[in-house]
Structure formats: C-alpha cells, structure tokens
UniProtKB/Swiss-Prot annotation:
It comes from Mus musculus (Mouse). PANTHER family: HEPATOCELLULAR CARCINOMA-ASSOCIATED ANTIGEN, HISTONE-ARGININE METHYLTRANSFERASE METTL23. It catalyses: L-arginyl-[protein] + 2 S-adenosyl-L-methionine = N(omega),N(omega)-dimethyl-L-arginyl-[protein] + 2 S-adenosyl-L-homocysteine + 2 H(+). This is Histone-arginine methyltransferase METTL23. Keywords: Chromatin regulator, Cytoplasm, Developmental protein, Methyltransferase, Nucleus, S-adenosyl-L-methionine, Transferase. The gene is Mettl23. It is found in: Nucleus; Cytoplasm. InterPro entries: Methyltransf_16, SAM-dependent_MTases_sf. Ubiquitously expressed. Belongs to the methyltransferase superfamily. METTL23 family.
C-alpha cells in the first residue's frame, strides 16, 4: 500500500484581479473562469477543444473557487475522456465542480455533491451546471460521515471524484468512511482524488488500512499534468499535487 504524505505548503485563494467579469453580491465578489482542454496534437489535423466555465466567489468557504487540485483532476478526466461516456460519476466536495462538469461534458452521467451544511456551495454547483448548459446533472447535499436519505438514495457509481477533499486532517476518516459506504453499492468503484501535499506529518496509510482500501499514485507526467498551466490557466502553478486512485484492497485495478 502506498503512503500518502504531503510535502508542500497551503495554497492561497485566487487573486480577485484574476477573475473575469467580476460582479458583486452582498459581501461577495464573483467572476467566471474559463478552462480550455485541447486534444493531443495530430499531424495535419485540427485539435478539438472542450471549454468549461466555472464561477469563482471569494468566500470563506473553500469550495467557492478553483483550487490547483481541481485542474489536475480535470486533466486526468480529459486524458481518459474516451472511457467516460455512460459512466456513473459522483463528485464529492464538488464546490465549483470543474472535474464533474468536464466529466458530464465528456458524456458521463454525473451527480455533484457538497456538504448540506453549506448551501452556498450547493448553489455554486448548480450555477456551474447552468453556465455549461447541463440541466441533467443532479446536485445533492452530502456531508462527510453522515448517512442521510440523499446518500442512501444514490445509485451505484463507477467513479467517485474528489479534488483536495483531504484538506483538514480531522476530516480524513469521515471522508474515507463516506467513500467506503458508497463503495458498498459497487465494490469495483474507484475513488479518483487529487491531493495537495501540505505537511510531512500527514498520512492516509493507516486509515486506508483500517477501511480495507488501497491507494495507487498516478505520475502526473503520465497524463500531461506535470506543468504549471493546465487548460490554458495559471493552475496548478508550482504547488505539489498528487493524483491518487483509491479502491477496495481486495480488488485489483
């Protein structure tokens, strides 16, 4: 089992000056950020481009703007886009939902979720769907460690997405417990997660063992994410991000 250990500092929220077309709400500064994902170069051919727009809101709640991990996870989805049509995909801790929105645009059947305790984050999920003309994408409240009627009613998933959900160490076990419950519906489901390393003292190894899970690290260079400016953005910058695939220990990838 691979150990997951952070190695880099916390990333600050985006600079307000970097947001496009800012608009004001009571106590909030909002804008739109555009990401362009391009196909690999083909000799003599055109490169298809997929555009995703997401809202950005400067707010104390973390999920209201794009973090470096989200762009890396979205790039992994884009690299594997041909495997996504028809797949059932759930994004947890979605916030502005860049990975989930991209998956939906690539043909996956996507459900976006965020904490039911933060209605503004759920509103941001819905706004992302509206901006990308995805009325079919469902948004549900899902709080770490809580078995609610929403989580009970979720259908089996093929892929669970989570970008930078391992942010507060005190939440790590609640996150894995929630993922474990979701995996019970489909033991072959995979949890695709990006993780910004922040402290050498943090590790998921013990919790993964406790919950009978295993973790594989995916090299960033294997899906063209080993750069500072993915999807024509300024992210992930110089932050150290790891791509993880977590599954039940008894199942092989």
């Amino acid at each position: 089992m691979d150990s997951v250990r952070p190695r880099a500092p916390w990333a600050p929220p985006p600079d307000p000056a970097s947001l496009d077309s800012p608009t004001c709400e009571p106590g909030l500064m909002a804008g739109t950020q555009l990401f362009r994902f391009r196909e690999e170069p083909v000799p003599g051919g055109n490169r298809a481009v997929l555009e995703v727009r997401v809202p950005q809101v400067l707010h104390v709640q973390y999920g209201m703007y794009v973090w470096p991990c989200a762009v890396v996870l979205a790039q992994y989805l884009w690299f594997h886009r041909r495997s996504l049509p028809g797949k059932a995909v759930l994004e947890v801790g979605a916030g502005v939902s860049l990975p989930g929105i991209l998956a939906a645009k690539c043909g996956a059947k996507v459900i976006l979720s965020d904490s039911s305790e933060f209605p503004h984050c759920l509103d941001i999920c819905r706004q992302s769907c509206q901006m990308n003309n995805l009325p079919q994408v469902e948004v549900v409240g899902l709080t770490w460690g809580h078995i609610s009627k929403d989580i009970l009613s979720l259908p089996p998933q093929d892929i669970i997405l989570g970008s930078d959900v391992f942010f507060e160490p005190e939440d790590f076990e609640s996150i894995l417990a929630t993922v474990y419950f979701l995996m019970q519906k489909n033991p072959k489901v995979q949890f695709w997660s990006t993780y910004q390393v922040r402290s050498a003292d943090w590790s998921l190894e013990g919790l993964l063992y406790k919950w009978d899970m295993k973790c594989v690290h995916i090299p960033l260079e294997s899906f063209d994410a080993d750069k500072e400016d993915i999807a024509e953005s300024t992210l992930p910058g110089r932050h150290t991000v790891e791509m993880l695939i977590i599954s039940f220990a008894k199942d092989s990838f």
